[in-house]
């Protein structure tokens, strides 16, 4: 098992970024230390403006502040890019879907949101990943509750940031972020014991949530196959998180931002199914919010071979790709289509939709791949 406290790993990640960014980072490679990243938040970019002989100093400070912000955003996108790379390398279906969509719509492809799963215990829950996004200017928005699945989630709105010219995916408009957590204290004592066994054995792992996702490694040791099966019997979400950790659970294509005829989710669903892509059928392929403004669908998750600590190798669920169309709000229906902005469309998430999309990694849906 690779340790995220390894100085070699930190050095490798640090060296993977452009030299223009490395100078902005304060990095310590001693065991157990954190990589300190430049912040986008206003609190770390404030400049004191003075007059007279200090004017040149103020000008230099402004220049440095602007440069730091650009470097920070570039670094942030690079980390998202590493998360995306791990995700696409492990999951052939999302990679195929992106290629299929681009074969028809080769212009800018935007992500609506990125999603992650966590264990809500001992600091390993939503906050462990949220801190990475909050440091870069994201804003916490609404809480969603899923009592039947014993889950809760928070979504985060992105800061205003300039997309890379012509950039797609993580280099396009910054996506929303959706982070969920298992309410561990509501699970059976047996399930709680398994989860605590791994999270408590790695008490500092929660500090490296973003790094774990970017490197594609767990922050705890590989579990026993019997423990995975035990969790799966009570919560398939719990079992998924035990073996996938902070891996990107899914990315979501912003359907209405596509430029071709695929910019309507029903047409996109039909196109993908005709190409042999299996879509999550739980609650119907198309999930629609009560107000009709948020329409979503998703593929069935891919499976990968996983070798457990006891030497047993099994197929486990991995990740999937989602699609979201956000309709124009009623009060903006009279605005010309060419003038419609994202702020004119339905924002946020819907519990009923998300509840069914969670099941993209569940066995009932996975079995449809071979059905």
Curated annotation (Swiss-Prot):
<comment type="function">
    <text>Catalyzes the decarboxylation and hydroxylation of 2-oxoadipate (2OA) to form D-2-hydroxyglutarate (D-2-HGA). Is involved in a D-lysine catabolic pathway.</text>
</comment>
<feature type="transit peptide" description="Chloroplast">
    <location>
        <begin position="1"/>
        <end position="50"/>
    </location>
</feature>
<dbReference type="InterPro" id="IPR009770">
    <property type="entry name" value="HGLS"/>
</dbReference>
<keyword id="KW-0560">Oxidoreductase</keyword>
<dbReference type="GO" id="GO:0009507">
    <property type="term" value="C:chloroplast"/>
</dbReference>
<feature type="binding site">
    <location>
        <position position="113"/>
    </location>
    <ligand>
        <name>Fe(2+)</name>
    </ligand>
</feature>
<keyword id="KW-0150">Chloroplast</keyword>
<keyword id="KW-0408">Iron</keyword>
<dbReference type="GO" id="GO:0046872">
    <property type="term" value="F:metal ion binding"/>
</dbReference>
<keyword id="KW-0479">Metal-binding</keyword>
<comment type="pathway">
    <text>Amino-acid degradation.</text>
</comment>
<protein>
    <recommendedName>
        <fullName>2-oxoadipate dioxygenase/decarboxylase, chloroplastic</fullName>
        <ecNumber>1.13.11.93</ecNumber>
    </recommendedName>
</protein>
<dbReference type="Pfam" id="PF07063">
    <property type="entry name" value="HGLS"/>
</dbReference>
<keyword id="KW-0934">Plastid</keyword>
<keyword id="KW-0223">Dioxygenase</keyword>
<comment type="similarity">
    <text>Belongs to the 2-oxoadipate dioxygenase/decarboxylase family.</text>
</comment>
<feature type="binding site">
    <location>
        <position position="250"/>
    </location>
    <ligand>
        <name>Fe(2+)</name>
    </ligand>
</feature>
<feature type="binding site">
    <location>
        <position position="117"/>
    </location>
    <ligand>
        <name>2-oxoadipate</name>
    </ligand>
</feature>
<feature type="binding site">
    <location>
        <position position="113"/>
    </location>
    <ligand>
        <name>2-oxoadipate</name>
    </ligand>
</feature>
<feature type="binding site">
    <location>
        <position position="322"/>
    </location>
    <ligand>
        <name>Fe(2+)</name>
    </ligand>
</feature>
<keyword id="KW-0809">Transit peptide</keyword>
<feature type="binding site">
    <location>
        <position position="320"/>
    </location>
    <ligand>
        <name>2-oxoadipate</name>
    </ligand>
</feature>
<dbReference type="GO" id="GO:0051213">
    <property type="term" value="F:dioxygenase activity"/>
</dbReference>
<feature type="binding site">
    <location>
        <position position="296"/>
    </location>
    <ligand>
        <name>2-oxoadipate</name>
    </ligand>
</feature>
């Amino acid at each position: 098992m690779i340790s995220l406290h390894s100085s070699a790993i930190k050095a490798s990640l640090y060296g993977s970024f452009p030299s223009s960014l490395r100078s902005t980072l304060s990095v310590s490679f001693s065991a157990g230390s954190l990589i300190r990243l430049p912040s986008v938040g206003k609190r770390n970019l404030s400049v004191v403006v003075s007059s007279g002989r200090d004017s040149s100093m103020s000008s230099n400070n402004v220049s440095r502040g602007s440069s730091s912000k650009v470097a920070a955003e570039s670094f942030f996108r690079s980390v998202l890019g590493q998360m995306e790379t791990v995700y696409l390398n492990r999951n052939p279906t999302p990679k195929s879907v992106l290629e299929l969509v681009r074969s028809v719509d080769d212009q800018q492809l935007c992500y609506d949101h990125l999603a992650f799963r966590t264990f809500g215990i001992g600091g390993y829950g939503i906050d462990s990943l949220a801190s990475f996004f909050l440091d870069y200017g994201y804003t916490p928005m609404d809480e969603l509750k899923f009592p039947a699945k014993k889950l809760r989630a928070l979504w985060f709105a992105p800061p205003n940031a300039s997309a890379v010219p012509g950039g797609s995916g993580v280099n396009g408009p910054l996506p929303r972020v959706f982070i969920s957590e298992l309410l561990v204290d509501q699970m059976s004592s047996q399930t709680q014991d398994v989860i605590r066994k791994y999270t408590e054995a790695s008490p500092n792992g929660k500090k490296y949530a973003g790094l774990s996702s970017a490197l594609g490694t767990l922050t705890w040791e590989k579990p026993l196959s019997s423990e995975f099966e035990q969790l799966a019997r009570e919560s398939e979400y719990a079992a998924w998180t035990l073996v996938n950790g902070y891996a990107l659970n899914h990315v979501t294509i912003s359907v209405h931002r596509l430029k071709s005829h695929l910019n309507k989710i029903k047409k996109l669903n039909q196109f993908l199914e005709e190409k042999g892509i299996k879509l999550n059928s739980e609650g119907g392929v198309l999930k629609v919010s009560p107000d009709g403004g948020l329409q979503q669908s998703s593929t069935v998750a891919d499976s990968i071979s996983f070798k457990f600590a006891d030497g047993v190798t099994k197929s486990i669920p991995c990740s999937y790709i989602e699609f979201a169309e956000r309709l124009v709000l009623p009060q903006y229906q009279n605005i010309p289509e060419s003038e419609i902005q994202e702020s004119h469309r339905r924002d946020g998430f819907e519990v009923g939709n998300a509840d069914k999309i969670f099941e993209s990694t569940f066995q009932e849906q996975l079995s449809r791949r071979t059905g």
